[in-house]
UniProtKB/Swiss-Prot annotation:
UniProt keyword annotations, A-Z: Cleavage on pair of basic residues, Disulfide bond, EGF-like domain, Glycoprotein, Hydrolase, Metal-binding, Metalloprotease, Protease, Secreted, Signal, Zinc
Classification of source organism: Eukaryota, Metazoa, Ecdysozoa, Nematoda, Chromadorea
Keyword Cell division: no
Stated name of the protein: Zinc metalloproteinase dpy-31
EC number: 3.4.24.-
GO cellular component: extracellular region
Signal peptide feature range: 1-24
Bound cofactor: record note: Binds 1 zinc ion per subunit.
């Protein structure tokens, strides 16, 4: 297939069966050459001249469809029995119900995660009968979904990475929509060892057929009998992030929040989940899971958003234990670094004969074995360099000490421009950590009702910079004081959608074992002889209890 030059920023303007809107997406392919701008106004076309049976079956036989629906109904019943925290209080006569219903209808016009509104398992997963049966039977036994791993376990459903993945279109999409879909496939080609080849004449063997018969939907993994499988992409799904999400399903990936370790990172708010959707939140079985050592990722493109499947769209169904990660989950802009890392571990681990000494959480790039694939914010052969600013002179390595050092978005307090990016690496002296605080006015574009950042300042303060960090956006200065787990802290400024006021922050170095406050004044003496009284001071430690 023809390869597009690596792109850091890709803007797509889509008007198709939705109110006009601008949708921007960023593609980090490891290098910057050009901005690729695909602009189109797709004609308002019919969904797809498909029969009701085609919409209902989605590639299954009538008997297979009945079997899947049987087990999905059982899962709904099981979810309601296990989690009866809520019940349907809606009444058409209730004014609050009418207001909330209108709010829900208004929110649907934005469709940040259109795949959530599907009628399939978890909204967009088309199950085969044996998958539906396995999920239900193991949920019945263990209370969890017994799925082999975040990546599907069966070799029968794994694609052969040494052979091209054949795909075609069935005529549902305009030529411009087809080009957007192919851009998403080309991006995946650039960042993995997988190759996609279009062949509209293929009529046998495994292949992906892009259609528009049932919203955003896909099977999970390769068809085990070597037949075609459908990936449905309706007009509202023609966005790079949503396409990447559905193609990831086709390659064998489940949703992130279904991992067995999810309860260490998020809290499922069962009382806020729609009564027919509780079965969508069951977990994988921890006894039979392998996530290839890749940790839970708040920024995964496979993660539900905060209010997915809620009884009303203003209720949270997923809360992050660390509050500052709340606006990170649910993004549909691009594959996260860990999404790509897991895909390469599953499919491409044997491509390069030598593993490079990559830094900052990077790994040997299976597409270019002489270089490392680096987390956002880093570049260079071994990820040893901070990514330079894009569209502005900004970012870089900052050595901090006990005094405050300030840094800000481009032009602050004037507005930054759409498309500008900055990356900072803040470094404290050995044995110390970095403390960071936001100061001054703060403004970054967000979807307030969805609790989701569109443009953001991301802070990575963990021991692994491959992990997506805490994203800050919207209006009002964040009050959080952030401390790093090591001597280093990464700050990423990303403006994909629009300009704004931006941010200003300050940083300093603190002792790793905590910082003592000043002594308080002596208290008054309690005896006339003097030489008595007391004074005190406190110590604030960045991570847990202070050492004695």
């Amino acid at each position: 297939m023809s390869l597009l030059r690596s792109a850091s920023l890709l803007l797509v303007v889509v008007t198709a069966a939705l109110p006009p809107c601008t949708l921007g997406y960023s593609l980090h392919d490891g290098s910057r050459l050009d901005d690729v701008i695909a602009e189109f106004t797709a004609e308002r076309r019919p969904r797809r001249l498909a029969t009701p049976a085609q919409r209902r079956l989605m590639g299954l036989t009538e008997e297979q469809h009945k079997t899947v629906q049987f087990y999905l109904d059982k899962l709904r019943e099981l979810g309601n029995r296990r989690h009866p925290e809520s019940y349907n209080k809606d009444s058409p006569k209730n004014e609050a119900y009418k207001w909330r219903k209108q709010m829900r209808d208004d929110l649907k016009t934005e469709l940040l995660n259109p795949e959530k509104y599907g009628r399939h398992f978890e909204g967009d997963i088309i199950l085969f009968p044996e998958q539906a049966k396995q999920i239900y039977e193991n949920a019945l036994k263990t209370g969890q979904r017994r799925v082999k791993r975040k990546f599907i376990g069966s070799d029968l459903r794994r694609w052969d990475p040494t052979r091209p993945i054949i795909y075609s279109f069935d005529g549902s999409h305009t030529s411009r929509e087809q080009r957007i879909i192919e851009l998403a496939l080309e991006h995946r080609h650039n960042i993995t060892c997988l190759n996609f080849v279009r062949n509209d004449n293929a009529n046998k063997g495994n292949r992906i057929v892009f259609t528009d018969v049932d919203g955003c939907a896909s099977n999970v993994g390769r068809h085990p009998l070597g037949e075609e499988q459908l990936v449905s992409l309706a007009p509202e799904c023609i966005r790079l992030g949503v396409i990447a999400h559905e193609v990831a399903h086709a390659l064998g990936f489940w949703h992130e929040q279904s991992r067995p370790d999810r309860d260490q990172f998020v809290n499922v708010r069962w009382e806020n989940i729609d009564k027919d959707s509780k079965g969508q939140f069951l977990k994988e079985d921890p006894d039979d899971v392998d996530n290839a050592g890749v940790p839970y990722d708040y920024g995964s493109i496979m993660h539900y958003r905060s209010k997915a499947f809620s009884r009303y769209d203003d209720l949270y169904t997923i809360s992050t234990f660390v509050t500052d990660y709340q606006k990170t989950i649910g993004q549909r802009d691009q594959l996260s670094f860990n999404d790509i890392r897991l895909m390469n571990k599953i499919y491409c681990s044997n491509v390069c004969s030598r593993k490079l000494p990559c830094q900052r959480g990077g790994y040997t790039d299976p597409r270019r074995c002489d270089r490392c694939r680096c987390p956002d914010g880093f570049t260079g052969q071994f990820c040893e360099q901070v990514m330079p600013g894009y569209g502005a002179v900004c970012g870089g390595r900052i050595q901090v000490n006990s005094g405050w050092t300030r840094f800000s978005s481009p032009g602050y307090p004037r507005e930054f421009k759409e498309g500008q990016e900055c990356s900072w690496l803040l470094v404290a002296p050995p044995g110390q950590v970095v403390e960071m605080q936001f100061i001054g006015e703060f403004e970054m574009y967000c979807k307030v009702r969805h609790s989701l950042c569109m443009d953001y300042v991301e802070v990575r303060n963990s021991t692994d910079f491959a992990n997506t960090g805490m994203r800050y956006c919207c209006y009002g200065t964040p009050s959080t004081s952030i401390r790093s787990a090591t001597t280093d802290l990464v700050v990423l400024f990303r403006s994909f959608y629009r300009g704004g006021r931006g941010f200003e922050a300050r940083a300093r170095a603190l002792p790793a074992n905590g910082q003592w406050a000043s002594w308080t004044p002596w208290t008054p003496c309690t005896a006339s002889c003097g030489a008595c009284g007391s004074r005190m001071r406190t110590r604030v430690c960045p991570h847990g209890a202070c050492p004695c």
